[in-house]
């Protein structure tokens, strides 16, 4: 956490603040509405099924160079977190085959398809990549617009701190 004071570093939010989250409005902190999207195999996955542990929802597109650059660090984070939290990558791509070039079945992150972009619209997402950290109760705690390196230690500490 370069540039952060030792007081900030020692707070529970310190690791999250090191990732430079974007401000949230009061309404954004409300309970996230449930959604259900197909994964790469076509199986429907709901946000409700992920509740009870932290969830990082990251909106992605194959035509977005920063998204493609960010994807390996999301995979690494998902592998590091294991069952402690969920990393859900939500793709707005219409072409499932394009998406399969970047993620294989059995990916450590859950890869979901939002071809209609209804879920991304419900989050107010219009820039990619954009990620939201949701606590176990289903409330958005942090929003991150633009690419991040999710493989840094602060990312795992931030998410694990919400358990």
What label would you give each PLM region?
Residues 2-34:
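N-proximal helix/coil linker or "cap" segments that precede and/or mark the start of modular domains
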Residues 56-57, 87:
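Hydrophobic beta-strand anchors of alpha/beta hydrolase catalytic cores
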